[in-house]
């Protein structure tokens, strides 16, 4: 009996980083029931995430024993290099969102502590998503990520737009989840398995099955919604605009990284990428995402909506990587999503630092709110400038390296049309990213509606924003270190 118990405990070692976050959730719940304290709750959340991150890094370095999964868990989850790489990114992004939330909620008089609880619960779902290798764990972890987001998006419910964004995401996300379930049912009916690898083994006998193609298409529709890929992108700008700034940051970083990692593993492990119909569907989604995302962003006057449309275009670039090089897309897609997530944290972080949850008129999301920011806050302007240049793919930023790899992936797959689409999309994107930069350096308005404190760089959120800016510049100047780092993200 003791041996059995010890084996069970050893089988939980690979999950130690996730268990650390689960324990943090319990501690936060107890802390809230004992005495409400924003500082205590925020500190516990950050400490718990740091512990999980350090355990994960220790396991990757071989310092901490990572054990082996119990047989029952092996059917649902896998802890490989790909999962560990994306878990590191999720931990870093969740830490950034927690610290930005602390600064954002400082002036909120209502309950602040529950936001950390929801964010930690959602992070557990995200961590499980990148490890899922079974359709049951696929759906379970996805819902663990999504359900807390409904409350997080509506957290500043005193603002109509925030409440609207939460309700809109709830309704549309539920529809996407139902579509995913239906697709899973069709695939199971055809191949008789919910595990990714057995689906791949039976694919040769059911290659042209209409039921399999329909199931794969329905699953791709659900995945496209979660990724904000066209034509399932309509919700993105509205939800980004209405969401509290730190939650928009979370949606653009943690949620996107987890969903893309799950999608890549699903497509590679099941070999569904071998289906010509799936390849064509991905190509259409990628093309529409790049064109619609960039063209619609050109007309935006809201920075948050602009970043929302920008995210649609960037998901298109990653889809091109997946459809072009197939099973080799794991490391490049992970690298692209990591840099995109860090850039989103920097851009939305500036919005968060300048916003207040109690302004019924909204947050600092209009471009006019940033007019002349350079003359008041030059360092903050430098942060936003670097983020915009990285999103545009300008040299000496990490965004340039990832976009270059996306083009090279399309060329390697001889998808010349898709390579041209990346170049065209980048050219269009350059216009609206530079428009943001011109606004920052214009002559300031006489009346300043939104501003940040002079000591913003010493606050927790400000430190995190500066840190991700340094990462973007470092990997842009020394890309070899980023490439070596991303090469670890391989699916076994």
From Swiss-Prot:
The keyword Oxidoreductase does not apply. GO terms for molecular function: NADH dehydrogenase (ubiquinone) activity; NADH:ubiquinone reductase (non-electrogenic) activity; quinone binding. Keywords: Cell inner membrane, Cell membrane, Membrane, NAD, Quinone, Translocase, Transmembrane, Transmembrane helix, Transport, Ubiquinone. It is a multi-pass membrane protein. It is an enzyme of class 7 (translocase). InterPro entries: NADH-Q_OxRdtase_suN/2 (IPR010096), ND/Mrp_TM (IPR001750). GO terms for cellular component: plasma membrane. The chain crosses the membrane at residues 12-32, 44-64, 76-96, 115-135, 138-158, 169-189, 212-232, 244-264, 272-292, 306-326, 334-354, 381-401, 416-438, 463-483. Its main location: membrane. The keyword Cell membrane applies. GO terms for biological process: ATP synthesis coupled electron transport. Its EC number is 7.1.1.-. It catalyses: a quinone + NADH + 5 H(+)(in) = a quinol + NAD(+) + 4 H(+)(out). It is found in: Cell inner membrane. NDH-1 shuttles electrons from NADH, via FMN and iron-sulfur (Fe-S) centers, to quinones in the respiratory chain. The immediate electron acceptor for the enzyme in this species is believed to be ubiquinone. Couples the redox reaction to proton translocation (for every two electrons transferred, four hydrogen ions are translocated across the cytoplasmic membrane), and thus conserves the redox energy in a proton gradient. Belongs to the complex I subunit 2 family. NCBIfam families: NDH_I_N. NDH-1 is composed of 14 different subunits. Subunits NuoA, H, J, K, L, M, N constitute the membrane sector of the complex. This is NADH-quinone oxidoreductase subunit N. It comes from Psychrobacter arcticus (strain DSM 17307 / VKM B-2377 / 273-4). The gene is nuoN.
């Amino acid at each position: 009996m003791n041996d059995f118990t010890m084996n069970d405990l050893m089988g939980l070692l690979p999950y130690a980083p996730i268990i650390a976050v689960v324990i943090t959730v319990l501690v936060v719940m107890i802390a809230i029931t004992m005495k409400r304290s924003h500082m205590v709750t925020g500190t516990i959340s950050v400490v718990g995430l740091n512990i999980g991150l350090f355990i994960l890094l220790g396991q990757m370095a071989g310092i901490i024993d990572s054990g082996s999964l119990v047989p029952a868990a092996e059917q649902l989850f896998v802890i490989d290099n790909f999962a560990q790489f994306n878990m590191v990114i999720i931990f870093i992004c969740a830490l950034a969102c927690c610290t930005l939330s602390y600064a954002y909620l400082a002036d909120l008089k209502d309950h602040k502590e529950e936001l950390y609880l929801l964010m930690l619960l959602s992070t557990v779902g995200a961590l499980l998503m990148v490890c899922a290798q079974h359709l049951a764990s696929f759906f379970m972890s996805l819902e663990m990520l999504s359900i807390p987001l409904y409350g997080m998006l509506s957290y500043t419910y005193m603002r109509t737009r925030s409440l609207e964004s939460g309700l809109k995401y709830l309704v549309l996300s539920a529809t996407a989840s139902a579509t995913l379930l239906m697709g899973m049912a069709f695939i199971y009916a055809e191949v008789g398995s919910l595990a990714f690898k057995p689906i791949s083994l039976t694919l040769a006998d059911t290659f042209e099955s209409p039921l399999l193609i329909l199931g794969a298409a329905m699953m791709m529709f659900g995945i496209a919604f979660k990724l904000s890929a066209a034509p399932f992108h309509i919700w993105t700008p509205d939800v980004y605009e209405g969401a509290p700034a730190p939650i928009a940051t979370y949606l653009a970083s943690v949620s996107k990284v987890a969903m893309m990692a799950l999608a890549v593993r699903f497509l590679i492990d099941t070999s569904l990428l071998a289906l010509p119909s799936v390849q064509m569907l991905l190509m259409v989604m990628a093309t529409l995402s790049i064109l619609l995302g960039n063209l619609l962003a050109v007309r935006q006057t809201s920075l948050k909506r602009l970043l929302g449309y920008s995210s649609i275009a960037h998901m298109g670039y990653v889809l091109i990587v997946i459809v072009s090089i197939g099973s080799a897309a794991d490391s490049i897609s992970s690298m692209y999503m990591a840099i995109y997530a860090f850039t989103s944290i920097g851009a939305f972080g500036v919005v968060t630092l300048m916003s207040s949850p109690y302004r019924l008129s909204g947050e600092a999301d209009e471009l006019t709110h940033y007019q002349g920011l350079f003359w008041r806050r030059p360092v903050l302007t430098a942060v936003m400038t670097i983020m915009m240049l990285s999103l545009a793919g300008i040299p000496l930023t990490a965004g340039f390296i990832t976009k270059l790899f996306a083009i090279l992936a399309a060329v390697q797959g001889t998808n010349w049309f898709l390579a041209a689409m990346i170049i065209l999309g980048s050219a269009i994107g350059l216009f609206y990213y530079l428009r943001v930069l011109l606004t920052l350096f214009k002559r300031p308005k006489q009346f300043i509606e939104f501003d940040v404190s002079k000591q913003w760089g010493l606050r927790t959120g400000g430190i995190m924003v500066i840190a991700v800016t340094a990462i973007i510049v470092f990997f842009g100047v020394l890309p070899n270190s980023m490439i070596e780092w991303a090469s670890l993200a391989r699916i076994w």
